[in-house]
Amino acid sequence: VILYPDGRVSPRQAHGLECWGDNVRAFRVDGSFDDCQRLAKQALADPDLRARVTLGTANSISLGRMLPQAAYYAHAAAHHFGSPGRPLHLIVPTGNLGNASAAFVARAMGTPLGEIRLACNANDTLPRFFDGGDYAAQPTRTTLANAMDVGAPSNFERLRHWHRDDAQLCAAL
């Protein structure tokens, strides 16, 4: 099952999500990416549903998606200007924070990564947090960068857990 926000992906992207055949069903959700993610999390948390079917995710809710992404960063760092030991600095689009989380995993595993900076669009949940506010999910705003249109990035709590406190998290990003 694939869930995606109706009207928030291009026709080409929608085709790519819908063309898999009989064993994969794609559903357009009247809402945002956050709404799709909420539905997926509800399904994963439903014990009756989990007893009937095997569930998993292919997005960054799952560490199974994040670990291969960490390998991309290790590969990039290994080939960065051909200079061993020279850290690779990153600017990562925010979205659901899966890529940023993967970068932190890669660095924790010893990949020579320098600064990890986040790029945000009009969905400013994280800039509000970094500007000294409390973390508070925001309604999703539709932009041209639909992969970044997330008002409640799931991996924020994961990043928060990996740092001692919010000050350390802010310093790391």
Each model region followed by its residue ranges:
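PLP-dependent amino-acid enzyme catalytic core
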Residues: 1-173
